[in-house]
């Protein structure tokens, strides 16, 4: 659709920062959403308003406007360049569907188009976007057109560490349940605080899932929030095992260690998952089960070589025993393992 002169004027106006005494102009031009001005970031191509502080790209903003049956914004965003076909994933009334048709939308979307829109919409990892994706795709009949395996592959790829090493996600779950867990996991992985609180308040039966995601994705901030403030608990050794699933998870491993988890068990789990940095970090914290873990490293020559050497000792510069996530993040941000350095400088000849 070619933009009219009026829509171009609105786009320019939305890119400016007007004083409050000129807000009436924005209301007159329908540049008003969630009782506040609509702004358009021309560099990032993002629509922002009070209810969507993180911003939404044009196509996603259109999806939201269609879901809300906001006819003025549907027309505006389409004139600004949004693909009206994206609106078909969230249309919920015949009147809005008719408007989409008038603006050039297809009668229906095929499997490839639905999957592409799903992938595009989930690209931006912001609270506003993830919550919207959950609302749009939850129990969405359009997803019945998409091959179930293709949808599950899209979900499983970003959560592959959890898929491989826990039984908390599997093919027995309905697609709707998998999507809910997926959106929640993405919120935790990227520490999207508003989205985390949205899911936490609405889906209390997934509290353990939240804690698991925080441990696996090394989000020590939400781990602390969930454990200390929201009182979400798991077996401590299981918490440590989940923290060891993914390599470089120093912050969540250390958090569990301070709580009292067994560091030798953490070393064992790290070796089982072939996570070398985690393994060296456990050595720094005092893990010393080298001979006991040799059979576990069977078939992985590098780990067997590391464990066979008698050159390791706990770090002489102990870390502060504190569960404050700010302190943990600060101390471990640029952490270099003493025992890893010892191994790398050792002459293996």
Curated annotation (Swiss-Prot):
UniProt name for this protein: Protein MGF 360-12L
GO-annotated biological processes: taxis
Q: What is the lineage of its organism?
A: Viruses, Varidnaviria, Bamfordvirae, Nucleocytoviricota, Pokkesviricetes
Q: Which domain of life is it from?
A: Viruses
Q: Which UniProt keywords apply?
A: ANK repeat
Query: What is stated as this protein's family in its record?
Result: Belongs to the asfivirus MGF 360 family.
Pfam families noted in UniProt = ASFV_360
Task: Provide the residue intervals of the ANK repeats.
Answer: 57-89
Q: Which InterPro entries match?
A: ASFV_MGF360 (IPR002595)
Signal peptide, first to last residue:
none
Q: What does this protein do?
A: Plays a role in virus cell tropism, and may be required for efficient virus replication in macrophages.
